[in-house]
């Protein structure tokens, strides 16, 4: 699919109106992502908004707020590993990773077409440490995690800032 056109200049204007200054190197990939999202949305209904501007102000701006919070308020003693369960349209993940690239970020999506969308975006706009994992966020995911590090259960011990989710059963 050919992406809809989103102007980086419009994107910079929208960001300024929302209280953000986007780096030059972020504008083109973020505009490209929004264009792809709008194009795929016509066929797959990824988001409820119908224009790139509405999508920016109702959805993408949340990613920018989250990125600001993570940069300014959360201090981790080790590189974080984030799991975005039910990533769908790549929100908040893809815009977030365009402005905050600490550690690893896994977008977990069960639906094949949505996982394909996420993979397509990452193929066109590579984001370091950002991955798509197509699996249901249930038993299969937890079994896969058991073979790796206990990322989720140790998150509270790694961060010196606020803890958002600690899945460990033992205190």
What are these regions (language model features)?
Residues 62, 84, 109:
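Acidic active-site catalytic centers that drive phospho-/nucleotidyl reactions
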Residues 89-102:
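Conserved SAM-binding loop of SAM-dependent methyltransferases across substrates and taxa
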Residues 103-106, 110-171:
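S-adenosylmethionine
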């Amino acid at each position: 699919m050919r992406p809809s056109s989103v102007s980086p200049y419009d994107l910079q204007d929208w960001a300024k109106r929302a209280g953000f200054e986007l780096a030059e190197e972020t504008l083109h990939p973020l505009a490209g992502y929004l264009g792809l999202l709008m194009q795929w949305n016509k066929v797959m209904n990824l988001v409820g908004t119908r224009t790139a501007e509405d999508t920016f102000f109702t959805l993408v701006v949340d990613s920018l707020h989250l990125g600001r919070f993570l940069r300014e308020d959360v201090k981790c003693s080790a590189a974080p590993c984030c799991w975005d369960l039910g990533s769908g349209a790549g929100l908040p993940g893809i815009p977030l990773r365009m402005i905050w690239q600490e550690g690893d970020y896994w977008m977990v999506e069960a639906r094949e077409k949505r996982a394909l969308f996420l993979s397509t975006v990452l193929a066109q706009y590579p984001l370091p440490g950002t991955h798509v994992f197509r699996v249901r966020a249930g038993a299969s995911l937890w079994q896969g995690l058991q073979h790796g590090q206990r990322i989720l259960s140790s998150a509270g011990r790694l961060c010196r800032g606020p803890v958002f989710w600690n899945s460990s059963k033992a205190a």
